[in-house]
Each structure stands twice: as structure tokens, then as C-alpha cells.
Amino acid sequence: MTNWQLKLADKTTKIQVQTGSSQQLLTAWPQLEGRKILILTDSQVAPLYLQRLVQQLAAVSQVFTQIVAAGESSKKLANVEICYQQLIENHFTRQDYLLCLGGGMVGDLGALVASTFMRGLHLIQLPTTIVAQSDSSIGGKTAIDYHDVKNLIGTFYPAEAVLVDPELLLTLPQRELAAGLAEVIKSLLISEQQPEDQQLLAQITPDELTKTALLARLVTRGLQIKSQLAQVDFYDFKERRYLNFGHTIGHAVEALAAGQLHHGEAVSIGMVTMMRALVAHQQLPTSVLTQTQQLLSSLNLPIEIPQQFTHQQIMTKLMTDKKANDVGIQLVLLHDIGQPYLQTMTFTDFKQWLGW
């Protein structure tokens, strides 16, 4: 078991990584006893874990559930309103809890609801995907998509506890597990290397991904990197933006794919696209690109922009990116592994820099 506390602004988040902890929630967070709890989950996760969770908590708490359709399209204002209605009808107060059981979509949606209902409910994250377990469940960002713009409406609201059970990852399809690992690989690329990081990267193979011990180490390392960056830059003005490496192109490709690509697959494409341009401009060692491409390809992750998307379509999508401004767009670039930096380019300069 690994435990630590993350202090962000005026809030403290307890982070716990422990195999099997999802079956011992009251041990991990006894404050749930005697409170009303709304469990928010999606249609994919609910059949796997919802009943087990309700049975644990119903003996000592009033438990309510809200299931939304699986997928990014559920991260919308209509579902925020549905959750509000549940909370109002069941007379929730600020002393009660919203528990997010799911991946990044559920975590983002639920955290936004918790942050805005009565100006703040207690929030617990129980992430079930590798992206959520290693990254999105901590740091306090909440969001929904609006008018086809990703994460346009949101707040900063750290959870009181993030309870990570790597065992939950074993039910993920291989494709989804690999896509999630793209985010862990990204974190290892932008972080100052620790002695164990190269060993971790070497162990990321399809055959090893069924082992909870390795999954626990990977999500723990991802959370440690995210914790360090969020602590020095909670409101996302500088260092925390390093976590967006690969996301500029990635978000555009993901939006154009309209659900045909997982988020991590789009990030994989985005990272390689940026690294190829950096190598072409002699701003990144070729060996870093080669190692990254080989690792991503070994997991069957895409590294090429789908042929049906034109460069102009991608550039048009970039104009609605949150990192865009009147000058252009802020990019996350790499000098080398563990040496990220920010640079703003005009859209014209960026297109030329990419060789498009």
C-alpha cells in the first residue's frame, strides 16, 4: 500500500494506492458512515462494480446511484442537471458525499457537480481506468464539454480522497489499457528521471499488463509526477501545463475521430507528431523519438495521424483549444526526457514548424 497527502490551495487530498481497497471503502474512508452518498458511474462500469459498492455502504449510509452512458459524450451539461436533480430530491447537504466510480469522464463530471452544488459537497474519487488512476483523479480539475469544445466549462476542486485499486484495471479491454498507458508514458517523458523509471518503461509490454504489481507501480509513479506539478502550479499557469504534452494535436485528432479513437490513442499520435517535428528541427535527440515510437507501437498504439484528417482540419480544431489565445497557441515541447518547456507560436508558424 502507498499513501500520501497532496496539499492544493486550501484543500488536502488523501491518495491511497492499494490492491483490493475498493472492497474496503469504509476502512479507507470511515467518514462515509452515516452520510448520504451519491455514487456516480457509467453504463460500462456499473455492471462490474456498482452492486459491490452499494452493498458495502448501504448498511451504514443512505446510498443513491446515478448511471450515465459510457463515453465522452456524457460529459455534458444535461448530465450535470440530472445529478443536481438527484441531490435536490434526496435532500443532500454540504455534509454529504458524491463518489465518482469510473474513468476520466465520470471523474470530471462528478467533480464539477460536487464543486458547484451548494458550493461544495464532499468528493471521493474511485477511479477505474489507468488514465484516471494515474492522472485525472487528482489535481482538482473538473470539467464538461460544451458546444463541441472539450473541457470548456469547469472548476478547480480537489477530492478529499482518491482511492486507487489497481485490481479494477484487470477488467479493462487490452486496447483501453494500452491507451491509458500512453498517458503514463507521457508523464515519464516530461518528468525528471528517477532510477526506477527506465526499468518501468522496459517492463511496459502487453504480456506484463496483467500483473497488478506492475500496474500499481505505474499508476503510483504517474500520480507522483502529477502531484509534484499540481503542487507547484495548482491553477495551471506554467509547470502543470507540461502534462499537456501531446494533447494539442491529440485533442484535435480525438475530436475529429468522433469517438473512434480513445483519448490515449490520440495523445500517442500527438506526442509522436510533436517529437518528429522537434527532431526535424534538431531540438530533440533522435534516440528519444525512436525509443518512444517503439514503445508505443509495441502496445499497438497509433503513431500516425489518420489519413482521412487533413492538416487544415486539425489546425481549425486547434483554434478552439484552451491553450489558444490572440497571439497563437502555447505548446509543450521537449529538449530531452525530463526537460519540457512552453513555447507560444502563431498558428501560421506552428503549421510551418510541423512541416505542413
Mark where each language-model region is.
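Glycine-rich beta-strand-to-loop/alpha-helix junction loops that act as flexible
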Residues: 70-71, 101-103, 245-246
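C-terminal charged capping/lid subdomain of soluble metabolic enzymes
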Residues: 2-4, 290-356
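A glycine/threonine-rich phosphate-anchoring loop and its flanking beta-alpha core
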Residues: 9, 112-204
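Short glycine/serine/threonine-rich phosphate/pyrophosphate-binding segments
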Residues: 105-112, 133, 252
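Catalytic-loop motifs flanking and including active-site residues across diverse enzymes
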Residues: 79, 177, 267-270
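ATP/NTP phosphate-donor binding region
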Residues: 1-96
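Active-site segments that bind and position negatively charged phosphate/pyrophosphate groups
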Residues: 206-309
